[in-house]
Design a protein with these regions (language model features):
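Amphipathic, heptad-repeat alpha-helical segments used for oligomerization and assembly
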Residues: 241, 245-248, 262, 266-286
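Amphipathic alpha-helical coiled-coil/heptad-repeat segments
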Residues: 2-20, 28, 48-49, 61-65, ...
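Nucleotide phosphate-binding site architecture
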Residues: 48, 279, 292
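Extended, amphipathic, non-transmembrane alpha-helical segments
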Residues: 30-42, 93-103, 258-268, 272
Length: 314
């Protein structure tokens, strides 16, 4: 380009075509932007490679990990709730059996009943005690529903806190054991059905003594050797266990609700970082599509300008 009397004139050359070079550069850039826009819209992601937003991608990766851990914690809580529901169902069944035992004992006290009648009651009475024991031995996916002895091998005491293998730790945050924990106790059903002696229906039953949960027929108590008061205490003990179970279930349900809300908020935050704005990106796509076509047309036009120089040579 030369200046003649204040006027700029474009040189006409054969070896170099500046207009075509600039048009080619613009075509390359517009095609690159067009491809990037197509990739964002097809993937639904604003960040398709680290170069798009390195900082945002790093934050998104941490949020995604937190979301995964939160969902895992929710799954664990749901399994714990299932454990508690099965446990409560077993406690309900145990309560019905104890209630039936009390009824049989009361029926056996009828002076109009013969020895044969009482023996018939006793047959059912002894059989139900074995069913009670079967309930105390129930498991959930291989995990015992109820506690039997302490981790040290000693007897547990009903109404007192249990430790060790009788407590299941449920982690209720995405931080694992560094976060909040709910302790799910294995109810001391065996202790609730065990008393110090047949002459004393002790309110604070212990895990060693006389039990109405018989491991076999030989260990069962005869109907005439126990009083109705024992069943009253046993029912009160089971009611306490169900109350403890219900309290833990309520806490776990609140923990699950909190985690679900937290997961939703984390996903929303991650979406704001990673997800593409379809309206904005569609506008950009249309823009770069037009520019690419225009650049291609102008490149073709620029490539014809050197024909003028050839005409001058002719």
């Amino acid at each position: 380009m030369t200046n003649h009397g204040g006027l700029f004139q474009m040189s006409l050359t054969i070896n170099t075509n500046p207009a075509a070079i600039r048009a080619s550069f613009n075509l390359t850039e517009n095609n690159k932007n067009l491809q990037a826009s197509l990739t964002r819209l097809s993937s639904g992601k604003r960040i398709t490679k680290p170069a798009d937003d390195a900082g945002g991608l790093a934050v998104s990766m941490k949020l995604s990990s937190s979301i995964s851990r939160t969902k895992a914690a929710i799954s664990n809580i749901q399994n714990s709730l299932s454990f508690g529901e099965v446990q409560d169902g077993a406690l309900q069944a145990g309560a019905r059996i104890v209630d039936r035992l009390a009824e049989l004992k009361s029926l056996s006290l009828d002076v109009m009943k013969s020895d044969a009648d009482i023996e018939n009651y006793n047959t059912e009475f002894r059989s139900l005690q074995q069913q009670l024991y079967a309930i105390t031995a129930e498991t959930f996916n291989g995990v015992s529903l109820f506690a039997s002895t302490l981790a040290t091998g000693g007897a547990i005491t009903f109404g007192h806190a249990t430790t060790g293998k009788h407590t299941i730790s449920v982690f209720t945050s995405d931080r694992g054991n560094a976060g909040s924990v709910v302790s799910l106790n294995k109810s001391a059903l065996s202790a609730a059905l065990t008393f110090k002696s047949l002459t004393n229906a002790d309110q604070e039953a212990t895990g060693s003594g006389i039990t109405i949960a018989a491991v076999n027929s030989g260990a069962a108590i005869d109907i005439q050797n126990i009083t109705v008061s024992f069943f009253t205490v046993a029912l009160e003990n089971i009611a306490t266990l169900r109350a403890e179970n219900g309290a833990t279930m309520t806490r776990l349900q609140f923990a699950e609700d909190h985690l679900r809300l937290s997961s939703a908020n984390l996903e929303a935050a991650n979406s704001r970082i990673m997800d593409v704005d379809v309206a904005t990106e569609s506008t950009a796509l249309a823009k770069y599509n037009i520019l690419s076509q225009a650049s291609a047309a102008m490149l073709a036009q620029a490539n014809t300008t050197q024909n003028t120089a050839l005409m001058l040579l002719g």
